[in-house]
Amino acid sequence: MSRMPSSFDVTERDLDDMTFGERIIYHCKKQPLVPIGCLLTTGAVILAAQNVRLGNKWKAQYYFRWRVGLQAATLVALVAGSFIYGTSGKELKAKEEQLKEKAKMREKLWIQELERREEETEARRKRAELARMKTLENEEEIKNLEKELSDLENKLGKK
């Protein structure tokens, strides 16, 4: 049996339909360098703050410099990712049109599948009705043959 189309076939959810956490995960998967840069920058700030508290100004200065460099690298990754993965308004509208066409095609396929199933069901009903009628005819014929046989036996028994 062929795979049936379903109204639950969803390939990609729209960003508007996602929760806040799902959106964060989606964007982190799309541009993995940005969250890595954020984590490294945060680590550099924490180490710098720890060394400031301990009074080690040389190491604190060292980690603050790392923070600046990591923050710059994160911004470069963010801009580069936006440039690479960014889409214009026309591309978004084209994608929307494709999704609408795909939805219409799915609906059309679903209707065709339902019509095919209906035809199969109707054919099965007709076959079942024909089988019932044939069974009734055969039962009547069997009764007639049994009656004829009993008549013949009675004739033979009388002679």
From Swiss-Prot:
Stretches in topological domain Mitochondrial matrix: 31-35, 86-88, 157-159
Residue intervals passing through the bilayer: 14-30, 36-57, 64-85, 89-106, 134-156
Topology with respect to the bilayer: Multi-pass membrane protein
GO cellular component, one term: mitochondrion
Topology Mitochondrial intermembrane: residue spans: 1-13, 58-63, 107-133
Subcellular localization, as worded in the UniProt entry: Mitochondrion membrane
Keyword Endoplasmic reticulum: no
GO biological-process terms attached to the record: mitochondrial cytochrome c oxidase assembly; mitochondrial respirasome assembly; regulation of proton transport
Coiled coil listed as a keyword: yes
Coiled-coil region(s): 88-159
Other remarks in the entry: Present with 1210 molecules/cell in log phase SD medium.
Entry function: Assembly factor that plays a role in the assembly of the respiratory chain supercomplexes (SCs) composed of ubiquinol-cytochrome c oxidoreductase (cytochrome b-c1 complex, complex III, CIII) and cytochrome c oxidase (complex IV, CIV). Involved in the recruitment of COX13 and RCF2 into cytochrome c oxidase. May also be required for late-stage assembly of the COX12 and COX13 subunits.
Protein name: Respiratory supercomplex factor 1, mitochondrial
Protein's organism: Saccharomyces cerevisiae (strain ATCC 204508 / S288c)
Gene name as annotated: RCF1
